[in-house]
Amino acid sequence: MSIRDWPEAERPREKLLEQGAAALSDAELLAIFLRTGVTGCSAVELSRRLLSEFGGLRALLEADLASFCGHLGLGVAKYAQLQAVLEMGRRHLAERLRRDSILESPQAVRDYLKARLRHEQHEVFACLFLDTRHRVLAFEVLFQGSIDGASVYPRQVVKRTLAHNAAALILTHNHPSGDARPSLADRQLTARLKEALALIDVRVLDHFIIGDGEPLSLAEYGWL
């Protein structure tokens, strides 16, 4: 049965307009994005099938072009649309972050870092550079690969801090495994960077580790 034949209150688009996007299931949201199904399969049914094949919404959103287009109902045009939507979301979060001091919008910081790093398949280390009023100057990825004491160079972090004329930093890196708990190496690296930046009177406000859930704050655990 086509979605057009469903009761109006159950159609994804009408339901979104009536109740808001948060009221929709993953399959219903995806169905609105897809717009149409395939022969013998409504957009919602196709969405459920795709979510099952990918193993969930996150895997679908993070799929590369070849993987994405290897599924029925998906192609290059949809992939391009999806990447544009995801990038608009990241830019929206970045604008929110730049408007105010990060101390006034701590959740915006977490949301932004999640959007930037959660999809990465390999470890990525980045810095959020802040001015004297703790407003964002820049976000920059500095290192990629295995993030440990041997691969992250304090002198490079100091160099980029001076280039941005930053007064404070937020450090961040992701754990592709999804487990955000810090390793001993993570804590040692944080201490080394804090010490190096203190020499130029720059504060490290926090170090967030991005996993599957909410970003883990080393400062909140007293590890900074």
UniProtKB/Swiss-Prot annotation:
Domain of life: Bacteria
MPN domain: residues covered: 102-224
MF annotations from Gene Ontology: metal ion binding; metallopeptidase activity
Protein name stated in the entry: UPF0758 protein PLES_57141
Similarity section: Belongs to the UPF0758 family.
Positions of short motif JAMM motif: 173-186
Keywords assigned: Hydrolase, Metal-binding, Metalloprotease, Protease, Zinc
Classification via InterPro entries: MPN, RadC_JAB, RuvA_2-like, UPF0758, UPF0758_CS, UPF0758_N
NCBIfam families in UniProt: PRK00024.1, radc
GO BP terms in the entry: proteolysis
Residue ranges that the Swiss-Prot or TrEMBL entry lists as coiled coil: none
Positions of Zn(2+) binding: 173, 175, 186
Cysteine-cysteine disulfides: none
